[in-house]
Amino acid sequence: MELFSFSILYACLCLSLFYQPARTQQAYINGSTLWNCSGNPATSKGYLCDASVKSCEAFVTFRSRAPHDTAISIAYLLGSEASKIASINKVSASDKIPSNKLIVVPVSCSCSGNIFQHYSPYTVIKNDTYFKTANDTYQGLTTCQAMIGQNYYDPENIPVGAVLTVPVRCACPSENQTADGITSR
């Protein structure tokens, strides 16, 4: 019995030598954050910067939907380059992309404060709200909390024609991730 207890203890000790805690890079936003613009959780602002990496070329994904259904219109909305979008996705810059097709969009991602973001200007149209712009127009690539934090317009009264700064969520791989072969391209 003593030998059995010692064997169990020895096995546990050996296994503990191989223990490596998982280190997650980011927290993900949950449904209540997406549907509630009045909260201000830190995770709704974007992904935290790694102290050693300040910027990178990254990408986001976007589903083509009218009026954002050409490489040109998607580039204009997301502050990217139509020629790069067209090349990556093997489409023409000006041809209509089939509705709901997932498009890879290259963006310049940089650390602003302690959050990775890509900034894109957006001109407000009638009936726009931060919530509608974040969730419908930008398809969740930003949050209404991040937009409210970045712009000075009253959330209940954004004037038509106002140009908003949209902080698009992006992230760059850490040095450890890059060493492991992960790239942002």
Regions inferred by a protein language model and the residue ranges of each:
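N-terminal V-set
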Residues: 28-37, 87-91, 96-99
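Loop/turn positions that initiate beta-strands
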Residues: 99-103, 127, 161
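Soluble extramembrane regions of membrane proteins in the secretory/endomembrane system
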Residues: 167-169
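N-terminal signal peptide
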Residues: 4, 12-36
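Primarily a LysM-type cell-wall glycan-binding module
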Residues: 2, 28, 34, 39-83, ...
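Eukaryotic helix-linker segments that join adjacent hydrophobic helices
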Residues: 75, 84-87, 99-103
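Short acidic beta-strand-loop surface patches of small beta-rich interaction domains
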Residues: 86-94, 148-155
